[in-house]
Amino acid sequence: MADQKRLEAGEDQLKRLLAAADKLEIIDLSSNYMRGLDRLDGTLERSVFWDDAYCSYGTYEGGPEGFVEYCQSALKSHLSNHHFLGQINIEIEHNEAFGEVYYLSLIHI
């Protein structure tokens, strides 16, 4: 009985560690997305999207290739771009993640 409880506790800890690792990966993707915008690095920005992603941003609707072109084109005329990440709230449910990433952008035109 005691061994079973230890095993269950270990499984719970492993699940929590894997969820934490998944959340950190999402935070890294968010950071790389902002870095790609700030450095005008389309390759880095593109790397955060799945190939079959659909981007719905109001002013752009479509796939990641077009979205990256849209962003890089819009930002290249600026003197500087600085995106700062704020609170990041992520919930993991089975094989899906849901959440919000807040950011502040300072753009020098």
Predicted feature descriptions by range:
Residues D41-S105:
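A solvent-exposed, acidic/Ser-Thr-rich amphipathic alpha-helical stretch
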Residues I107-I109:
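Conserved small/polar residues in nucleotide/adenosyl-binding loops
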Residues M1-R35, R39, S47:
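Short, low-complexity N-terminal intrinsically disordered segments enriched in polar/charged residues
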